[in-house]
Amino acid sequence: MKQQLVFEAPRRAMPPQHLADLDETARAAAVTELGLPAFRAKQLANQYYGRLIADPQQMTDLPAAVRDQVAEKLFPTLINPVREIQCDAGETRKTLWRAIDGSTFESVLMRYPQRNTVCISSQAGCGMACPFCATGQGGLQRNLTTAEILEQVRAASSTMRAEHFGRTAGTAGGGRLSNIVFMGMGEPLANYNRVLGAVRRIIAAPPNGFGISARSVTVSTVGLAPAIRKLADERLGVTLALSLHAPDDELRDTLVPVNNRWKVSEVLDAARYYADTTGRRVSIEYALIRDVNDQPWRADLLGKKLHGALGPLAHVNVIPLNPTPGSEWDASPKPAEREFVKRVRERGVSCTVRDTRGREIAAACGQLAAEG
């Protein structure tokens, strides 16, 4: 059955409040409400964001007499791992999470020689209905809370810190999570306020956040033009990744149904506004599909439009289409891929083929379906 475009998540009971849902002011108020001294708010935040501890029983600077109360009110268990599978010689790990209400979603931890990246979900499911994406074909269950998003980051950070994966101390990869990409399940800008809260805590220094550089955080979108402009005005300095997948409205209306609301020209105008406002280059994501969007003339048109709209502030990531169950489409052959990249570059636009990880375990771009 063809999925319909959904912007508003179904109304469902939301999880209990967690420390990670709260900003600095709200944390102080919550601690005071528990009858604890105000300085405990900073201690709790430092334990969570700095030491990556989410169990008050392990917080040695917290009096034992109040740990149960703090656990109940500020550290409920929001998500539990259901299954973890690995590939790429253990360098890629996909985790299926289940929330309190039974909603499921996935995150993917990827280790590279010079960086460690976690791909996180912002929604359980997705309402954008892109026909080549397993997540979009599954429909939208609900938005994730800020804390549910941040728990994926904390879990990945904790894993990296504990295991180090045998890397040499002092290398950029090492035992530290270095990059966050909002490219898992869901449309991040359709869950704007909670994603924004998560981004702010990801980039804030401890004890108010994980202290990851804004330049190492990527927020993807299928092209919600007003929200792109709104994100630009936040001036957070994160990277914007625009899932374009076609340079012409006729095809993009089908491949990316949100294009029926905001056309290619409107989305590229918003991307230009983002680049001008933040000074950051915009990543253009383009899943290359055999005989669908890989024609030489579409490469020429893509290069022409991006050069006109963004100039040197655009970089195209060509993504060989990853297989999904029941899909009638497959990836373009390598000669067509090379020709496509060459033609985009000839138009003066930076273009490379993405190093795809996790295809064997359905953890690559467009494959996340939270099947448990």
Curated annotation (Swiss-Prot):
Required cofactor(s): [4Fe-4S] cluster
Q: Which PROSITE patterns match?
A: RADICAL_SAM (PS51918)
Q: Which GO terms describe its molecular function?
A: 4 iron, 4 sulfur cluster binding; metal ion binding; rRNA (adenine(2503)-C2-)-methyltransferase activity; rRNA binding; tRNA (adenine(37)-C2)-methyltransferase activity; tRNA binding
Disulfide connectivity for this sequence is: C119-C365
Localization, per the record, is: Cytoplasm
- List UniProt keywords, sorted A-Z: 4Fe-4S, Cytoplasm, Disulfide bond, Iron, Iron-sulfur, Metal-binding, Methyltransferase, rRNA processing, S-adenosyl-L-methionine, Transferase, tRNA processing
State its Enzyme Commission number(s).
2.1.1.192
On whether ATP-binding is a keyword of this UniProt record, the answer is no
Domain Radical SAM core, which positions?
112-359
Q: What is its main location?
A: cytoplasm
Name the GO cellular-component terms: cytoplasm
Catalytic residues at E106, C365
Reactions accelerated catalytically? adenosine(2503) in 23S rRNA + 2 reduced [2Fe-2S]-[ferredoxin] + 2 S-adenosyl-L-methionine = 2-methyladenosine(2503) in 23S rRNA + 5'-deoxyadenosine + L-methionine + 2 oxidized [2Fe-2S]-[ferredoxin] + S-adenosyl-L-homocysteine; adenosine(37) in tRNA + 2 reduced [2Fe-2S]-[ferredoxin] + 2 S-adenosyl-L-methionine = 2-methyladenosine(37) in tRNA + 5'-deoxyadenosine + L-methionine + 2 oxidized [2Fe-2S]-[ferredoxin] + S-adenosyl-L-homocysteine
Cofactor note (record): Binds 1 [4Fe-4S] cluster. The cluster is coordinated with 3 cysteines and an exchangeable S-adenosyl-L-methionine.
> Can you tell me which residues the record assigns to a coiled coil?
none
The cross-references to InterPro entries, in alphabetical order and at most eight, read: Aldolase_TIM, Methyltransferase_A, RNA_MTrfase_RlmN, rRNA_lsu_MTrfase_RlmN/Cfr, rSAM
Stored Gene3D superfamilies:
1.10.150.530, Aldolase class I
Q: Which residues form the signal peptide?
A: none
Q: Name one Pfam family in it.
A: Radical_SAM
Protein family according to the UniProt entry: Belongs to the radical SAM superfamily. RlmN family.
Question: Other notes on this protein?
Answer: Reaction proceeds by a ping-pong mechanism involving intermediate methylation of a conserved cysteine residue.
Give a short account of what the protein does: Specifically methylates position 2 of adenine 2503 in 23S rRNA and position 2 of adenine 37 in tRNAs.
Q: What is the name of the protein in this document?
A: Probable dual-specificity RNA methyltransferase RlmN
